């Protein structure tokens, strides 16, 4: 689910935090990609196009086709992807997972009714709602990435949190996902639509964490409380508090504790045993592997291994697979070109970095204005009247 309404809130109140770019502008960048989100996109996309790719036994292969060709496209554009897979979900997410199970059950009933009625549009709609990424999908995707020479990371818990940790450690430039909670976990950069197909012609949206905080005029902790108020995966939200009201409350009271002391609970009922403190802890100190100890390596593809894995039962075209492998090898050899900014060391971000940067920027602007004023005054005094 991510954070409800966060993308629009940032677009409305901190538009300077969003930049639209073509994929080619990320040449030379290393990017941590939310693997489960990608696999879901691939399964949905192929199903919505009306052709479910499958093995001779009927097992889906659309996730593998999507992963194979979309990864080649990223590498063709000089981007070095590292895929991050979800681990065990935190206990606090059980409520959200239960809601998803309920929605799935409702979709199954609706699909049955649509099938009996012969309504093709409704059948397609509810079929897509029933798509989910399984452990087998993830296992196959990891095997494919290994043969392609592309690194992946198994997160102990949430993939977005692990991606954010890799960004903060300076291992990669950004997190690529459609879930906005990557920002709540503190990812310095968030890329949306990076893994979308070229046919959709969607520009990549880049969100800057520092500029989000500056634009919203919040500290990192206040931003986390804002996200909890707006609605996250880890706890319920206060009924009647949407994005607009949430930002007003945070700006007025600065934290959830003070909000609860002042809010009109008859108008905005607070959930019973509201576990917002634990949710806050999960965002501040998520369960992640030590990013500094993770060694990311992009190696040459195993062409014969790819043919053996994708062709045969999975029915991929051998010629296309071999052509894909050659593109992978070519992009690996072309990666000797680097971005100019890669010559400079990327320092791991610190919790107070964004707040300090904002203060420093304000002080520099004030100093610059004073200097300019002083120069103008002295120039005026030294000029002779004509």
UniProtKB/Swiss-Prot annotation:
UniProt cross-references to Pfam families, sorted A to Z: XPG_I, XPG_N
Keyword Magnesium annotated: yes
Main localization, broad class: nucleus
GO BP field: base-excision repair; DNA replication, removal of RNA primer
Stored SMART domains: HhH2, XPGI, XPGN
Region of interest (Interaction with PCNA), residue spans: 336-344
Protein name (record): Flap endonuclease 1
Annotated organism of origin: Drosophila virilis
Phylogenetic lineage: Eukaryota, Metazoa, Ecdysozoa, Arthropoda, Hexapoda
The encoding gene: Fen1
């Amino acid at each position: 689910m991510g954070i409800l309404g966060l993308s629009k809130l940032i677009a409305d109140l901190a538009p300077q935090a969003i930049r639209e770019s073509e994929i080619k502008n990320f040449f030379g960048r290393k990017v941590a990609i939310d693997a489960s989100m990608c696999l879901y996109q691939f399964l949905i996309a192929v199903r919505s196009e009306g052709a479910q790719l499958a093995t001779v036994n009927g097992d889906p292969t659309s996730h593998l086709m999507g992963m194979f060709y979309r990864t080649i496209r990223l590498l063709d554009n000089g981007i070095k992807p590292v895929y991050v897979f979800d681990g065990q979900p935190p206990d606090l997410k059980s409520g959200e997972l239960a809601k998803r199970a309920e929605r799935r059950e409702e979709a199954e009933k609706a699909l049955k009714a649509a099938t009996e009625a012969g309504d093709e549009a409704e059948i397609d709609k509810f079929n897509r709602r029933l798509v989910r990424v399984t452990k087998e999908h993830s296992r196959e995707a990891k095997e494919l990435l290994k043969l392609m020479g592309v690194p992946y990371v198994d997160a102990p818990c949430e993939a977005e949190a692990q991606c954010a940790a890799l960004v903060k450690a300076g291992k990669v430039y950004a997190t690529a996902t459609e879930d906005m909670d990557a920002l709540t976990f503190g990812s310095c950069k968030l890329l949306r639509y990076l893994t979308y197909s070229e046919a959709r012609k969607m520009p990549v949206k880049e969100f800057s964490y520092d500029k989000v905080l500056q634009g919203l005029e919040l500290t990192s902790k206040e931003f986390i409380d804002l996200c909890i108020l707006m609605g996250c995966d880890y706890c319920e939200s206060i009924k009647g508090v949407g994005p607009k009201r949430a930002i007003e409350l945070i700006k007025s009271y600065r934290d959830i504790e003070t909000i609860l002391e002042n809010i009109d609970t008859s108008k905005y009922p607070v959930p019973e045993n509201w576990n917002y403190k634990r949710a806050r802890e999960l965002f501040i100190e998520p369960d992640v592997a030590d990013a500094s100890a993770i060694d990311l390596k992009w190696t040459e593809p195993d062409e014969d291994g790819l043919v053996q894995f994708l062709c045969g039962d999975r029915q991929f075209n051998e010629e296309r697979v071999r052509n894909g492998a050659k593109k992978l090898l070519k992009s690996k050899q072309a990666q000797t070109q680097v971005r100019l900014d890669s010559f400079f060391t990327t320092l791991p971000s610190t919790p107070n970095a964004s707040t300090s940067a904002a203060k420093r920027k304000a002080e520099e602007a004030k100093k610059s204005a004073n200097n300019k004023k002083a120069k103008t005054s002295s120039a005026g005094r030294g000029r002779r009247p004509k």
